């Protein structure tokens, strides 16, 4: 009975979101809200790493890429990359694990540049069911990181509805980031393109609220001073500044870091202001600032579009490569 009820909720939410996604604007707030209400709903039970609920999130995200017109780049001609094997965990060391990534591809049109890849990513998992706080035990993960997933979806939608970019753009929703990045570990071991072809990775993490440490319309880039990417994106319209919370070591705390350790210029875009709902049941849709989120996604569209159509290759600052 519980399974049937959950399936009914899933179908109902999916139908609602499909109606919302019929809007034309690439950063339409109804689309953003609909996707957030789906991914961070109580029915998804917090999308715990490696769980059935994470699989539901993956299935939903894959269906959205298909609807948008992004080609599959996962296993066996599909969008899902099944992740299975022995992985490193934050607390338990190495152990067997099963999760999944969602991978889509927008082929570049330029014969000289299409083999260069722009990688846009977010993580779809959160921490699931946990200790009750004020009677609520569902850790919805609206800001962390449903907001990043929706940003990547909206950027994919915009790019897919334009003339194909010169470079190839790959979109990835990683699984099991919260438990140590098992999804990004597997991606690096089984990449859909040669790793050397990935020019840059931008991870989107926690953009659902403004950070009072910077201006209201600004986002920040982890590891800003480690490469020339941030200043270049800012020059092309991104409202990006350096991470105002260096003591938090955010550069090392998201999927981008695993790629950076492989030499890929990889950073995370965020506006996390250290709010107290982090990893709490209160990180829910009710606390998302949708005006900010819409503006944040829109502010990155032009710079990402430029990056996908330029021949610019970011480089690490001497001595700052991980």
Set out the residue ranges of the language-model regions.
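Bacterial N-terminal signal peptides
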Residues: 8-18
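N-terminal hydrophobic or amphipathic helices/low-complexity stretches enriched
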Residues: 20-72, 114-115, 317
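Second-shell loop/turn segments in exported
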Residues: 23-25, 42-52, 88-93, 133-145, ...
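Acidic/His- and Gly-rich active-site-bordering loop/insert found
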Residues: 39, 65, 88, 92-132
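A non-catalytic alpha/beta surface segment that caps or lines the substrate-entry region
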Residues: 47-107
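Alpha-helical metal-binding/catalytic segments enriched in His/Glu/Asp
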Residues: 104, 114-126, 130-180, 300
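His/Asp/Glu-rich mid-to-C-terminal helical/loop segments that flank catalytic regions of hydrolases
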Residues: 161, 276-322
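Metal-dependent peptidase/peptidase-like ectodomains
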Residues: 164, 174-268, 272-277, 315
């Amino acid at each position: 009975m519980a399974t049937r009820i959950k399936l009914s909720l899933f179908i109902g939410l999916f139908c609602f979101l499909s109606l919302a996604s019929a809007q034309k604007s690439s950063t339409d707030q109804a689309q953003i809200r609909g996707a957030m209400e789906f991914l961070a709903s109580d029915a998804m039970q917090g999308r715990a790493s490696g769980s059935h609920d994470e699989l539901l999130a993956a299935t939903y995200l894959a269906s959205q890429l298909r609807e948008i017109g992004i080609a599959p780049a996962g296993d066996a001609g599909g969008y899902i990359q099944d992740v299975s094997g022995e992985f490193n965990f934050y607390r338990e060391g190495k152990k067997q694990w099963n999760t999944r990534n969602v991978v889509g591809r927008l082929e570049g049109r330029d014969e000289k540049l299409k083999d260069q890849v722009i990688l846009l990513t977010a993580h779809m998992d959160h921490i699931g069911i946990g200790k009750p706080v004020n009677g609520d035990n569902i850790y919805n993960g609206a800001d962390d990181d449903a907001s990043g997933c929706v940003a990547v979806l909206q950027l994919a939608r915009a790019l897919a509805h334009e003339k194909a970019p010169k470079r190839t753009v790959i979109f990835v929703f990683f699984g099991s980031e919260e438990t140590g990045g098992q999804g990004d570990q597997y991606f690096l071991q089984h990449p859909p393109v040669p790793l050397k072809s990935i020019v840059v990775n931008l991870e989107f993490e926690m953009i659902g609220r403004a950070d009072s440490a910077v201006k209201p319309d600004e986002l920040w880039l982890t590891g800003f001073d480690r490469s020339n990417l941030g200043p270049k994106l800012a020059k092309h319209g991104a409202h990006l500044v350096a991470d105002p919370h260096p003591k938090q070591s955010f550069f090392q705390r998201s999927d981008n870091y695993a790629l950076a350790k492989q030499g890929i210029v990889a950073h995370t875009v965020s506006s996390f202001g250290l709010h107290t709902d982090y990893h709490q049941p209160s990180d829910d849709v009710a606390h998302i600032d949708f005006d900010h989120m819409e503006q944040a996604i829109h502010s990155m569209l032009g710079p990402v579009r430029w990056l996908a159509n330029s021949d610019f290759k970011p480089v690490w600052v001497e001595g700052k490569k991980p």
